[in-house]
């Protein structure tokens, strides 16, 4: 069985400002760095084999901070980058809502493209690290899309907002992925249930 813990990156200033980040390469803020340390402190008590990360700064830095506690190889994979939001990138929520009330942004990566990319990435991880325990540091919409696909569109999961630096655990056994738990955030100071 391959076990994967999906870690959402720590907070950025754009998260606070409710700006659409997508593929825009925004760094962690001080809170995000603290969240990454708290995550590292929490996951160090479990056995891991490797860390896979999106190459975007906010995910990569989260992975590096977590790795201060684990001392593992880190592998970057483009498959786990955030969704490309096209013309909406950098736009605050209020402006996006006014301009695009249907949440469909010009030049945006489709949900099908995103899901195919992410599931392809998971397949590569499973092939490269069979029966291993893998931390994957990625992004909110990316993790949400993976969980939605694996769950078959579970309505409760679809309505859940994944908090920064939350953990979601999935495993591959009997030729399929399944969700163990998601949006775990009790390790974060000031966590939200």
From Swiss-Prot:
Spell out the catalytic residues: 9, 82
Q: Which residues bind substrate?
A: 8, 15, 21, 58, 139
Q: Which domain of life does this protein belong to?
A: Bacteria
Alphabetized UniProt keyword annotations: Hydrolase
CDD domains reported in the protein's UniProt record: HP_PGM_like
Q: Cross-referenced InterPro entries, in alphabetical order?
A: His_Pase_superF_clade-1, His_PPase_superfam, PG/BPGM_mutase_AS, PGM_Phosphatase
GO MF annotation terms: phosphatase activity
Q: Per its UniProt entry, what is the enzyme's top EC class, as one word? A: hydrolase
EC numbers on record: 3.1.3.-
Task: Summarize what gene deletion causes.
Answer: No visible phenotype.
- Mind naming one GO cellular-component term on file for this protein? cytoplasm
Q: What SMART domains does the entry give? A: PGAM
Q: What does this protein do?
A: Phosphatase with broad substrate specificity. Does not have phosphoglycerate mutase activity.
Q: Which family does it belong to?
A: Belongs to the phosphoglycerate mutase family. GpmB subfamily.
According to UniProt, the name of this protein is Uncharacterized phosphatase PhoE
Q: Which organism is it from?
A: Bacillus subtilis (strain 168)
State the gene name recorded for this protein. Answer: phoE
